[in-house]
């Protein structure tokens, strides 16, 4: 028997229909098929969170074209593919929320586990967000961005041992590495009706690391 994921249990508890799909968002055809499946199984899409991401620990002079493309294909190209695919439905509905995940690395220039490819791709997400907000505004669609600091996720490459967390936390005013719940709370707000007059914004979620 398969154990339900936490998201599945939450959906059942609130009687929310769900559909889980594993998709390579760097593949335009796969994105189109996945969104089509969601559209046929669930109510119209009026909220999109672009959260997929990959990093790179490679120093700039050692970055190959393949490595550069690998990072941009997911972090920026994938964000473009998914957003472009779902935007028409939001326009038709006359309402929408688009939130993309950038990174503090886009603002500070790398650090932690990320280097130039990751920082550049996440900076592109911020520019994408601001430009798209201009075009989507007349359709009552908000477009925002969150820029997390160090978060305990798989993108850190399994390097966040308790010892490393403690070392990283020393530079964070709030004294700890972030959790996925810290980011999810902001994403949830930006998807809500309460955020209807917020667009083209980038929010730091880093425990104050931007001032250290």
Segments predicted by a language model, with ranges:
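The beta1-alpha1 cofactor-binding region of Rossmann-like NAD(H)/NADP(H)-dependent oxidoreductases
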Residues: 22-33, 65, 181-182
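Substrate-binding pocket helix/loop in short-chain dehydrogenase/reductase
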Residues: 59-60, 67-72, 164-168
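Active-site helix of classical SDR
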Residues: 83, 121, 129
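Alpha-helical segment proximal to the catalytic Tyr-Lys
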Residues: 88, 130, 134-135, 196
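Residue(s) in the substrate-gating loop at a strand-loop-helix junction
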Residues: 103
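Short, small/polar-rich loop/turn modules that mediate ligand/substrate recognition or access, typified
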Residues: 137, 142, 198-200
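Short C-terminal tail/terminal secondary-structure segment
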Residues: 188, 199-212
């Amino acid at each position: 028997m398969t154990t339900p994921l936490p998201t599945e249990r939450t959906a059942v508890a609130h009687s929310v229909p769900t559909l889980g799909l594993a998709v390579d968002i760097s593949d335009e055809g796969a994105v189109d098929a996945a969104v089509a499946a969601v559209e046929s199984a669930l109510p119209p899409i009026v909220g999109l969170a672009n959260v997929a991401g990959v990093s790179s620990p490679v120093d700039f002079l050692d970055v190959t074209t393949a490595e550069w493309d690998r990072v941009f294909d997911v972090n920026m190209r994938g964000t473009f593919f998914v957003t472009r695919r779902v935007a028409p439905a939001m326009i038709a509905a006359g309402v929408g929320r688009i939130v993309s995940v950038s990174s503090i690395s886009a603002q500070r220039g790398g650090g932690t586990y990320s280097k130039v490819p990751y920082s550049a791709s996440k900076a592109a997400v911020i520019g994408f967000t601001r430009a798209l907000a201009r075009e989507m505004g007349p359709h009552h669609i908000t477009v925002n961005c969150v820029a997390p600091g160090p978060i305990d996720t798989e993108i850190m490459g399994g390097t966040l041992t308790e010892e490393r967390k403690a070392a990283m936390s020393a530079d964070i005013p709030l004294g700890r590495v972030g959790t996925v719940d810290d980011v999810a709370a902001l994403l949830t707000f930006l998807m809500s009706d309460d955020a209807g007059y917020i667009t083209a914004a980038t929010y730091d979620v880093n425990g104050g690391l931007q001032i250290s």
